[in-house]
Each structure stands twice: as C-alpha cells, then as structure tokens.
Amino acid sequence: MINPSSDSRAYREPSLLGQTVVVIGGSAGIGIETARRARAEGADVILTARDANRLQNAATEVGALRTAAFDANDPASLERFSLDLSTPIDHVMVTGPGPRYWPVMEIDFEQARLAISEHILLALWVGRNAAGKVRPGGTLVFMGGTGARRPARGLALVSAATAAMPAFVAGLALDLAPVRVNLIAAGFVDTPLSASLLGDDLDARREQLRTSLPIRRVVGPADVAALAVHIMINETLTGATYDIDGGQQLIPG
C-alpha cells in the first residue's frame, strides 16, 4: 500500500473534491468532456442541454448528479433552472454555440438576433442567474472563438459577437466579484458539431490542420476540457481570455 505522505508523486487528492460543476450544453463534445474531467477531479456534475435523450445518455455515461433539459437561450427557462438549484454551485461551464455562416445580405432579423443572443445575451443571463448561486471564488467559464481576429465572408455578425466577449467577460468579472469569470477562445475543435458542419470535408480539414498547426495535431474536446477545469481549480484566474487553437492564429493567410 502506498503511503501518500511518503511520496507526493504517488498520490494527489482530486482538486475539485466535494465541489459541484454545472455544464450548460453538457450532452456532447466539449461539454461532456468537461463533465468527465470534472468528475475525475472529484466533482459532482449537473448537466443541461436541449435534447433530453442525448442528455440522459451523457448523464449515465459520466455519472451526473442531475440533469435539466431546456434551451439556455430562453431567459425564462434559464431562470427556472437556476431557481431550482438547491445545491450550492462552485463552477459553471457554458459551452456556447458553434459557428454560423450567414452572409450579411442574406441573414434575416431573427437570425441576427440569435447570433448575438447565443453569445453576449446568454453570458449576461447566465451571469445574472449565477449571482447568489455560485460561491465566492467559484467561476463562470464561457466559450468563445479566435475566428473573429481573422475576418472571413459570411462571418461578420458572428465574428462581431465573438469579438465582444473578452470585454464583456472582463467587465462581468468585476460586476460579479468575488465570483470569477473567464473566457476560453477556441480555434477549430474536433467535435461532433464540427463533423456535422464539415461533412465529407472533415478528414481533409483534419489533415490540413495536422500538417500546418505548430503542435502537429488537431485540438480535441478533451484539450478544451482540461483548460476549463484548470481555470476552475486556479482561484487566481478571473477576467481573462485563454486561447486554445494549437497555434492556428500563427499560420499566415
């Protein structure tokens, strides 16, 4: 039997032991990987998602404390979920939407509203509902992207909403202090959503990234989850944006 006190390398107490993590958008991809990582660090997890069947499958897989199926972009549903939380919450992870390719001359008003609400308004309403629920020193972790730093056709509105997130998160960190607020800005992540968007072009995209990225591999959901849990654990981190793109921004063009 290993004596923990005799060899610190042989034993490490889980860093989130006894804590509760809410993952909004926790049924697949980055969300379920974050839940899995949090569980490995000793946390209880509460998962939310739109699709009740996928949510239940994810909950069974990771051993979630509870689930709630609702659309987080609906303020009333989000408020009901928050009011129903009897367990003190330590951390909230919001996975956020995927990219939407909407040319500005073709997008309608409701699509434009959605592009903004899926980023800024979702973060605002999560922050407001977290007040009084998340403990001091706990954290809200939001997902954004690095794509806004390199303009592209069809992404003007989504890029604008994404680009606003770092400033919003920094301000929210001041408004909600001592609750911490941070942002993860991801490049391409090899998720089921990415696969559905790229279809038959997925393998070519993966190969292109493997050969061009400085890290010589594709960023996966587990990589993002590891960063999210690190942000939860390190209680000095707040108001900041953390890029995770494998060096994608360093590639010319």
Question: Model segments located where?
Answer:
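Conserved glycine-rich cofactor-binding loop
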Residues: S27-A28
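Rossmann-fold cofactor-recognition segment
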Residues: E61-A76
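Substrate-binding pocket helix/loop in short-chain dehydrogenase/reductase
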Residues: P103-V104, E110-I116, R205, L209
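Conserved Rossmann-fold SDR core element
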Residues: P166, D175-D190, L237-I244
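A glycine/serine/threonine-rich, flexible loop-to-helix segment
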Residues: V189-S212, G253
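C-terminal substrate-recognition "lid" of short-chain dehydrogenase/reductases
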Residues: R217-I244, Q249
